[in-house]
Amino acid sequence: MFLRLFKYLWPERYLPETPAQDPFDENPPPCGPGRVGVLLVNLGTPDEPTRGAIRRYLGEFLSDPRVIEIPRYLWMPILHGLVLAMRPKKLAPRYAGIWMEEGSPLLVYSQRQAAGVRQGLAARGVHAEVELAMRYGKPSIPAAITALRERGCDHILAVPLYPQYAASTTATVVDAVTRHAGRLRDQPALRFVKRFHNDPAYVEAQAGRIAEFWQAHGRPQKLVMSFHGLPRYSIELGDPYYRDCLDTARLLRERLGLREDEVEVTFQSRFGSARWLEPYTEPTLAELARQGVTEVDVVCPGFVADCLETLEEISQECRDAFVAAGGRQFRYIPALNDCPPWIEGLTDLVERQLRGWPTGNP
């Protein structure tokens, strides 16, 4: 308290001795073309596949009240007393099994997406700085915003890389970006992409990914579209996620020319004991095998970059469940990652959202 009062009474003591720019300069240098920033944001990942790194990541992730919507006084003892004591040990070998030479697949592919958008915008004459951030872990949202501000960006477009909107994903990115920007004295103008589940650029890229896979490997008896699950109460409270998932699935089915009975829409990654969106992916795959379906392909349209949930949960655990129940051929169709049609589509989406801002475009 006394320190704050001291700073208030003698603020000059805490100012830089030689400010980078005189704030009272009547003729400040003109701002360069990098006045617009694009912030791509994905979920996050541990820094390395070790128990300690996973514990730090889960601690931040599962402490978010948007993710775990139960009273803090009930949840925090469970988180620190049970979850963080047990889950890292179980998850460490699973992360190690998918780790790439460059690092976590989610981070590697997200970095490539950011680089692709940066190059794509520049090729179109759009002057914008592009940074990648993770909602949990590194690179952090505050660090990315700071980097954009240091390059003169006073307009920032935040793009949560979640096609379907959910409060536990998209909204918490909005929370984090506005919270950090709100602490700045010179705040940037902000825009957010709420969702792109039905955006033609996204749908075309995702459908093209599936069609390209089939052209190389042939079509299966059944296509399973597996989306990340949510507790049912989230939908009952007004979250549009379930509707977004069904819209995406319908658009992809129509674009691929499939009948309704050739596609199954399921939900994965259930956590805890609450009832989640159904049908669940793994039991559905086992039931399909028991019904005589011997060939399935699984695609995860809610993930634009491969990660633990796709490379381990779907490609390995769900494969084992399908084969154990009598299935013969199980194939996972990779996420969009850094495939050129998706980089082009994401660049299109970003360019459209930047209209009206000083990007150098007419």
From Swiss-Prot:
A single GO cellular-component term on record: cytoplasm
Gene3D superfamilies the UniProt entry points to: 3.40.50.1400
CDD domains: Ferrochelatase_C, Ferrochelatase_N
Classification via Pfam families: Ferrochelatase
Pathway: Porphyrin-containing compound metabolism; protoheme biosynthesis; protoheme from protoporphyrin-IX: step 1/1
Keywords: Cytoplasm, Heme biosynthesis, Iron, Lyase, Metal-binding, Porphyrin biosynthesis
A Gene Ontology molecular function term of the record: metal ion binding
Residues where Fe cation binds: 228, 309
Reactions mediated catalytically: heme b + 2 H(+) = protoporphyrin IX + Fe(2+)
Enzyme Commission number: 4.98.1.1
Superkingdom to which the source organism belongs: Bacteria
Signal peptide annotation: none
InterPro entries according to UniProt: Ferrochelatase, Ferrochelatase_AS, Ferrochelatase_C, Ferrochelatase_N
Keyword flag Metal-binding: yes
Any single GO BP term: heme biosynthetic process
Subcellular localization, as worded in the UniProt entry: Cytoplasm
Biological function: Catalyzes the ferrous insertion into protoporphyrin IX.
HAMAP family named in the record: Ferrochelatase
Family membership: Belongs to the ferrochelatase family.
Protein name: Ferrochelatase
The species this protein was found in: Bordetella bronchiseptica (strain ATCC BAA-588 / NCTC 13252 / RB50)
Gene: hemH
